[in-house]
Amino acid sequence: MQINFSFGVDVYQRQLSNLSVHIMHHKGPIILAGDFNAWSRPRVNVLKRFARRLRLKEVIFDNDWRTKAFGKPLDYIFYRGLSLNKAEVLITDASDHHPLIATFY
């Protein structure tokens, strides 16, 4: 599913709401990762509410080298039904986003 770029939060919230329908009905572990385009405080708030409502935990990176826009990280990993073992951000010039790596058990 694609979370499109738009300036308002209404479309963003609707897209995440559409995604939440699928996640709510999923039985078993979940890993949800990608570029969420959460480049503003209102978008970050919508994304965090989305994750809380679905009981998704956010992967926290000790050395947070995630790609940012306007000081906000764009890329996230959320999970449920798993335990986080390790998380890191690789620094590379192979893409305009640094890869996020997380291992779970």
Language-model segments: which ranges?
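Active-site regions of metal-assisted phosphoester/phosphodiester hydrolases
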Residues: 1-105
